[in-house]
């Protein structure tokens, strides 16, 4: 195993490069400087037992999990409808909510105009893991089946694609599909016909998610609690940045950034992707876990499992500004936003239903 390279701060990149690739509104210099000086850009070997990897937080790394929730003390905001089990993930598109439940080989489709109505059920060849909206289509990973499914919410049908590993995240890059394979510590690239083109597998402990934003692709490694740039031209894993002490959930915003929750330290991190650079770190005490983005309001929604709350931050400026703080169902591990209606939907991982909020 090659020893990790020496530490380099992000400020080693030229300021002109950062300016030319920056997207979205101007951010304050003081916050950007803090982020640049506090973030370390490293590469590391892929042996989890190696002691010299400076991105490794502990000797035997484990993925961060949601903090347990107490009993609720306030009525949840908005409307709560039965889910039929523990909600493990949510995604929404065109006024339709997709919900995955623990232990079910299916995804349930709810009409957000009438969330209390009986949902449609889309059967799958394996238990649904993560859900994501990709180019207007709901995509469900099925780790046990080594496959993912594209779900047409209009017809309630699923197109299943098998992959060479355990999929935990899917993203689109033009006409290519990127699939994070947790067990293979790799990202598989599929062409427009879903045929494998290449598998990129360098310097990861675990490939838990893959995201595309701002002209760049990023891999989330939850074991190492770090994000890594993915060079699709050279088919390599590039530089990495630590994402707090317990990277948990991730999404993207319209400013070309990847937003990551740090479940152990209680924070929301914002990374530019090209080049990979930490731009913002917002403390979010109370058990930060799930994250979703509302492009119409420019608000990042973060669930707080220790408090049974969801908090919304306006992320247009140099520092996130709190705009909303609302009570939720117990154990609010998952959250999504429907871009058509701007409704915020939260799932209880404690069998206490699905919460629909119109802020």
Placement of each model-derived feature along the sequence:
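Predominantly soluble domains enriched in secretory-pathway, periplasmic, or organellar proteins
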Residues: 2-6, 27-29, 40-359
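Bacterial N-terminal signal peptides that target proteins for export
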Residues: 3-32
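Sec-dependent N-terminal signal peptides
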Residues: 33-37
């Amino acid at each position: 195993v090659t020893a990790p390279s020496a530490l380099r701060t992000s400020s080693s990149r030229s300021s002109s490069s950062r300016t030319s690739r920056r997207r979205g509104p101007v951010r304050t210099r003081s916050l950007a400087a803090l982020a640049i000086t506090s973030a370390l850009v490293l590469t590391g070997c892929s042996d989890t037992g190696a002691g010299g990897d400076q991105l490794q937080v502990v000797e035997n790394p484990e993925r961060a999990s949601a903090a347990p929730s107490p009993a609720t003390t306030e009525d949840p905001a908005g409307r709560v409808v039965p889910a039929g089990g523990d909600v493990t993930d949510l995604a929404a598109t065109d006024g339709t909510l997709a919900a995955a439940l623990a232990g079910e080989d299916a995804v349930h489709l709810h009409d957000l105009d009438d969330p209390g109505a009986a949902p449609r059920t889309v059967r799958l060849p394996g238990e649904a893991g993560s859900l994501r909206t990709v180019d207007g289509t709901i995509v469900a990973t099925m780790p046990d089946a080594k496959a993912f499914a594209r779900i047409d919410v209009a017809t309630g049908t699923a197109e299943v694609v098998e992959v060479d590993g355990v999929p935990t995240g899917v993203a689109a890059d033009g006409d290519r599909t990127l699939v994070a394979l947790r067990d293979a510590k790799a990202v598989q690239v599929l062409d427009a016909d879903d045929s494998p083109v290449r598998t990129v597998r360098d310097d990861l402990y675990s490939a838990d998610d893959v995201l595309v934003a701002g002209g760049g692709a990023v891999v989330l490694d939850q074991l190492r609690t770090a994000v890594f740039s993915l060079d699709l031209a050279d088919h390599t894993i590039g530089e990495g940045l630590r994402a707090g002490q317990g990277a948990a959930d991730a999404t993207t915003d319209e400013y070309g950034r990847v937003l990551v929750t740090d479940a152990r330290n209680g924070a929301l991190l914002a990374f530019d992707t090209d080049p990979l650079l930490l731009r913002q770190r917002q403390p979010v005490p109370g058990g930060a876990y799930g994250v979703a983005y509302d492009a119409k309001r420019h608000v990042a929604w973060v669930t707080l499992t220790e408090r049974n709350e969801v908090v919304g931050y306006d992320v247009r400026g140099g520092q996130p500004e709190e705009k909303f703080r609302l009570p939720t169902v117990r154990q609010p591990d998952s959250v999504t936003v429907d871009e058509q209606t701007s409704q915020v939907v939260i799932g209880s991982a404690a069998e206490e239903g699905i919460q629909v909020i119109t802020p």
